[in-house]
A protein has these predicted regions:
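Short, charge-rich amphipathic alpha-helical segments embedded
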Residues: 133-162
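Short amphipathic alpha-helix with an adjacent loop that forms part of the alpha/beta core around
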Residues: 1-3
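Conserved acidic-Pro-Pro-aromatic motif
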Residues: 5-129, 134, 138-139
Length: 162
């Protein structure tokens, strides 16, 4: 059993069992700040939840969409490329969607959650704007050094140009 405060980041890729996983893991998600979940825009499996269903459940748990980690597209039949059956044009098929705790409600996150969200945003997704937002709120709370914003801005700039 995972302790309720032990989970910061969860990746869910369970081929149609996303809602069951979320429902059975609600207690583990209480402290989580990031969920990367595979969502489908077109059904691939029997009784597979749609993107809309997953989005609605995660929003009720206090998460909002942040970015796509990966997007898979396919051609729409009857168009087909025999040389590359998975060739894509514009039709969205599925994606790895990154949800984060609703950063527009920072008062609902602890200092530790904001710190962990900043670290995950920076290192996993290069989401320097989200990391900066977390650092801003931590500075406002005096939970970290007042000059942390300037230090992080310099770090993010060096990473972006590297």
């Amino acid at each position: 059993m995972i302790a309720e405060d032990a989970l910061d980041f969860l990746k869910i890729d369970v081929q149609g069992g996303e809602l069951t996983t979320i429902e059975n893991g609600r207690h583990c998600l209480a402290s989580a700040v990031t969920i990367q979940i595979e969502v489908s825009f077109l059904p691939l499996y029997e009784k597979q939840p749609t993107f809309a269903e997953i989005d609605q459940v995660l929003r009720t748990l206090g998460f909002i969409p942040h970015t796509f980690a990966a997007i898979n597209r396919r051609m729409i039949a009857p168009l087909f490329d025999e040389r590359n059956p998975c060739a894509a044009l514009n039709q969205l098929l599925e994606a790895d969607m990154v949800y984060v705790r609703d950063f527009t409600q920072p008062q609902r996150m602890s200092d530790e959650q904001l710190k962990h969200l900043a670290i995950i945003a920076h290192h996993c997704y290069r989401s320097f704007d989200l990391a900066t937002n977390c650092i801003f709120h931590l500075c406002q709370r005096q939970a970290i050094a007042a000059n942390s914003m300037q230090g992080y801005a310099a770090l993010a700039a060096s990473v972006q140009t590297a």
